[in-house]
Amino acid sequence: MRILLINPNRYKFPPVPPIGIEYISCSMEHAGHEVEVLDLCFSDDIYKDIEESINIFKPEIVGLSVRNIDSVLYHNNEFFLEEMRDIVKFLKYNFNLCVIVGGTGLSTNPEGVVDYLGADVGIVGPAEETINILIEDIKNKSLRSSIYHGVLRKDVSCKRKIDAIDYKIYYENGGIAGFETHKGCSSSCPYCIEANKRVFLRDIDHVISEIKDFVSRGYNHFHLCDSEFNEDLDYSIEFCESLKRASLDIKWTAYMKPSEFSKRLLKLMRDTGVYLITLTVDSYRKCTMYWSDVERFVFTAKPLGIKVVIDFLTGFPYEKEEEICENINLLKRLLPDKISVNTYIRLYSSTQITKIIRGDPELKKYLIGNIEDDSLIRPVFYNHITSDDIKKIIGEDPLFIIEGIEKGVNYCRV
């Protein structure tokens, strides 16, 4: 069948290439389908470009990538689904096409997102294998559900169609290429839609091959798309050893958690081109050992010449201001390169923190946003420590930024 894959993500702080579409398109082509990719990120007229692409390619199915449903942060929040919904309406009204949606954004509320967009069906989770099953069901007019759950029954070794995306324009506008070493996350952070998802480790040789492909095209700056690189310490070390043997002249940045690391790993990361690590830290029911791990991480990475930025999420239900102040002062003493503080917790119907807040009527007064909508599709935040409260704690210290007020990501601003 002929499938048109559309990237509707037009957020540019920074622009992020749609890596998922690259994997999916390659998987579908391997299964014998014809695939065309339409990237709308830098489009001047999205509907003109969509119409032109459809008239030339004549697809039978359209796939729409939903990377995020909004920009996640409270300050300067942008809601993305309205424009995506308009695109779906345009596709169905003008061309009567079957529309599939997929991507990380669906995990927030699968049925709710599919219904809001008016799509025919959605895939939740890794779609590299499931997409071809779904296409066959559409072809045979035998859809089993409005939601298909992505499952990888083998090693994550799906190849990637890098040619599908114009990386030159992304690099020219502050974006960089990404790569991933695994899918899923074993952590149980109560605020995260990726928590407790089965982990699939990718074939290391395939990941290195992807990076080599980019380098051969003149691109050598990368960010890691994994939620946290050190999901599996042994695998992370093995990956870095393989990358070091490849002797590639690259630089890259990664997110990590303050556990499952060693000096050996951090040295290997430095030796393979890592210049910046964003350490994800939160204050939800943390013990003394957790804060010791944070300290040990910073004190191990910094002497190796690696910049460390701490992304600190705090202000959870029942946390007192003095506790938050104590934790901020602890992080300040570590002297990382920057500390980004966020006290506005985005709620999703699928997360544990939402269940906790909904279970206590006294917490409802701390909700901000479209609080009458139980689907939580439109942004709703929990906040009882405001940005003004945080400003009083951090003062004018340039070490700190309040997340969201200044748009951008750490590899753009550190």
Task: Please provide the spans of the model-predicted regions.
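Acidic, low-complexity intrinsically disordered segments
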Residues: M1-R217, H221
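C-terminal accessory regions of radical SAM enzymes
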Residues: R2-Y11, G20, K307, E322-V414
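Short helix-capping segments at alpha-helix termini
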Residues: G32-H33, L91-N96, K244-D249, P303-I306, ...
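Conserved strand-turn element in the central/C-terminal portion of the radical SAM core barrel
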Residues: L40-S43, K257, V281-T288, V298-E323, ...
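Non-cysteine beta-strand/loop elements that form the S-adenosyl-L-methionine
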Residues: G63-V66, A127, L266-Y284, D337-R346
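Short glycine-rich, flexible loops that bind phosphorylated cofactors or substrates
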Residues: I69-V72, I131, E231, K286, ...
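Catalytic cores of alpha/beta
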Residues: P110-L117, L265, Y318-R333
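Radical SAM [4Fe-4S] cluster-binding motif and immediate context
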Residues: K159-T314, N329
